[in-house]
Amino acid sequence: MKKTQQKEIENVTNITGVRQIELWRRDDLQHPRLDEVAEEVPVALVYNGISHVVMMASPKDLEYFALGFSLSEGIIESPRDIFGMDVVPSCNGLEVQIELSSRRFMGLKERRRALAGRTGCGVCGVEQLNDIGKPVQPLPFTQTFDLNKLDDALRHLNDFQPVGQLTGCTHAAAWMLPSGELVGGHEDVGRHVALDKLLGRRSQEGESWQQGAVLVSSRASYEMVQKSAMCGVEILFAVSAATTLAVEVAERCNLTLVGFCKPGRATVYTHPQRLVHN
């Protein structure tokens, strides 16, 4: 086979974020075959012409990512602080060019950091270790959730991972109503980016998405807890386990953290008073 045929082949699917390449199976190393692989590209968030952060992400729903990141990192207080947004190609990836209000941009410049993150790295941009786990306003206790509604949501979480279904390479974050219905979700190669996309989407949906909880397909790290709390999410469900720092942050900011979510199973780490199980 020619070398040119061994290179990455142009995407032939209709799903953004997937590309076909040639690969070899263990039981047949003589004959390459085509398979789908998830795309991962550098995405720079550029505020008022200044690059603030570079994250590795899936090249889809980037406006929601930029909005959610801006909210969960405290760069903005509400979507109204952003006057405009454009996604444009750059030499090695993509840029999300964000027009920020003067007041919020002045605050950003005071703590700006230039960095390049790993895939969805939640510590990226932290200048000092003391900045990790920064205080978050304690959440109110306005939400409740019936754990009997969780199983059906878990069965439908994969519906929001079309790239993941093809490649086995993405995380998902979805918004779950008190009824257990998943009304929207996003996926990404980075779990933090998937969550930021969801939080950005939620900020645009209004009252219909205010009641409910976040369900993620990944583990619950402290960054996932802190991002959720920064955006007013009171309940976070994770398919995998939580870390000790995630539990500490959740306890401190009054977030109900639930891990090991499988049909018929869930482990509640903090603030179980929001949950019922009839």
From Swiss-Prot:
Cite the Pfam families for this sequence. Answer: FdhD-NarQ
- An example molecular function term from Gene Ontology annotations: sulfurtransferase activity
SUPFAM superfamilies membership: Cytidine deaminase-like
Gene3D superfamilies on file = 3.10.20.10, Cytidine Deaminase, domain 2
Q: Which GO terms describe its cellular component?
A: cytoplasm
Active site per database record: 121 (cysteine persulfide intermediate)
Membrane-spanning residues: none
The residues listed in the UniProt record as binding Mo-bis(molybdopterin guanine dinucleotide), with positions renumbered to this chain, are 260-265
Alphabetized, the UniProt keywords read: Cytoplasm, Molybdenum cofactor biosynthesis
Thylakoid is among the record's keywords: no
Q: Which cysteines are joined by disulfide bonds?
A: none
For the biological process aspect of GO, one term held by this record is:
Mo-molybdopterin cofactor biosynthetic process
Localisation per UniProt entry: Cytoplasm
Q: Which PANTHER family match?
A: FORMATE DEHYDROGENASE, SULFUR CARRIER PROTEIN FDHD
What the protein does comes down to: Required for formate dehydrogenase (FDH) activity. Acts as a sulfur carrier protein that transfers sulfur from IscS to the molybdenum cofactor prior to its insertion into FDH.
Q: Spell out the family assignment given in the record's similarity comment.
A: Belongs to the FdhD family.
Q: What is this protein called?
A: Sulfur carrier protein FdhD
